[in-house]
Amino acid sequence: MSLNLVSPGVKVREVDLTIGNISGAQEQVGAIAGPFEKGPIDVPILVENEQDLIATYGKPLDKDGQFEYWMTASSYLSYGGTLRVLRSDSSNLNNANAGVSVASTDIKIKSYDDYTSNTYTTFYYAAKNPGTWGNGLKVFTIDHFADQVISGISTTGISVGMGVTQSIKGRVRIGSGTTTSYGDEFVRGIITGVGTAGGVATDAITVKIVDRVTSAGVLSATTYDELKFLSSTTTTTTSSSSVGIGTTAGTVDLPNDITIDGITVSSAGGGMNSNIQLGDVVTVTGGNSIVAAGTTVIGISTTSGIGTVTVDRAITGVSTSGDGAIFTFTRTTTSSSTNNLNQTFIINDSGVGVSTFTSTTASDWYNQQTLGLTKGGDISWNTIAEKPGTSEYAESRGGSNDEIHIVVIDEDGSSSGVAGNILEKHLYLSKAKDGKRQPAEEVYYKNYLANRSELIFNGAHAGATVSGLTAKAGNASVDDFNLVTGGAWGQNASGVTFNVEGNRSYDLTGGKDYSGTDGYLIDKGDVINSYNILKNPAEYSINFILQGPSGGATIFDSQAKASALIGIANLRKDCIACISPHRAGVVNIPNSDTQTDNIVDYYAPLQSSSYAVFDSGYKYTFDRFNNEFRYIPLNGDIGGLMARTSINSFS
């Protein structure tokens, strides 16, 4: 609506009374480039406040004057404007990464576009952008590597890819409102890990349930929730019986004698069924002697079948040959039977038995898995999420074992200040290139990390262990099987049994900053190259170009940088270059006249321009991040004041 106002000095403004103005009605955008701690390289990201600046580009650092760039940006933002920040490039920059064949490799990923434009196979995981900030991060992954651990066995001759079988006869099968018992059937699994190489003890293997085989030899896919391997046990039953050896007459000559004389000690005659042996039990009937219960033979001497027996207890009473003492000998025999329950069989792909175990311990694999942190206390995977398995998307297309969990941890606390802190959790992602969560959320782990993670990219695919087996075609024996190959990650889910890698960790190392390993000295040419990205006014809308620190070791380097920024402003003709003097000309110069002369000398060679503003120095302010007072250039404040004035005047 048109307003015709005739009263002098009256103007109309729309004001939001909740905040006192119209926020964003007149956006004032600054721009700065420099060697920030982290962030994408040469990508002008719009930052609205100091919190965004910290989250995207890190904090000010007390190294090589890096804080001047950061605090200039912060000063501008404090006036209410927004800021396009560019992190400058350097030939020394390197992303922290976990290499494929080495601990880390030389790799620089500048940005998301740089990542998607290239193929990376020399690392498994890398920090999202270059710098030492990524050193110390650890990436942990886990997939459906195994269902159970079978321990207490000898692993000699056993290798990954062999089969495991166990009878399930007599086990109860729960149906819909009914229960039945399995007949002559057995469950099959595949070995995915052996000993310490499989992440378990030297006397253990990891096993994944695959299917069950009916008595008719029919394969039926099954899961760990339906069937599992039970611990193998052996029970021994022992029974005792008493066998009569025979009876024989004998004499006891002394009142408390331990010998019996004149007895038949062999089966040659005299009522004996077999020879008397040590340990036989002796009893007596008739005569005058008393033999204590449990008395046994401990010695035998004989001549022509007639002899003397020595016993372990004294016999009371004397019995002569006419007293009619009859001694009976019996023998206790022991028998035992062994019953093996849930025997576990290891077979190769030809159905040939490799090992048979009668004593094992079967336990859940996932519940034993931890991250393996050495600082801040370890964390169990089952406290983070349930075990990954097969996604609904893959299952509906005949695929399996595609799910994977990925967690990023600050183990030593260098990034977050808390050792063992979980920085990111990416759960139930898919190894399938077309993997989705219904209805259409992409969860292919490589793309998901690229789009959603703030910390890491994926490079090469891991997972080299096959996780399935099937009967050989045309073979009547289901003991003969083929491994299900072709399970590499990064293909469409249809019909693929994806390979597994288990519980893995990846240390990110090798990250480098702008100079040396962790320095921030940067060539002025690299900074100017970043500013040159802003030359096209149709691509990026900006109002103020902030010089930041004067840059360069000499006044000539500083003048070259200032001249380049003024040239960009002159070319665009829609923004102002905010320039501060050479640092060495004003900081720590006690004489104000000398400072003035230095400022004049600095600005004199610079070209005149309607699109540049020169200020006169550096301000002394407190850096709360490093607990120290700093000198920083005023161009951030000058640009901020102009932005604030514009906002107040035209909003």
List where the protein language model places each region.
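A glycine- and small-residue-enriched flexible loop/hinge signal that marks low-structured segments
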Residues: M1-T234, S239-I245, S336-S651
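Polar, enzyme-active/binding microenvironments
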Residues: V194-A201, G246-T333
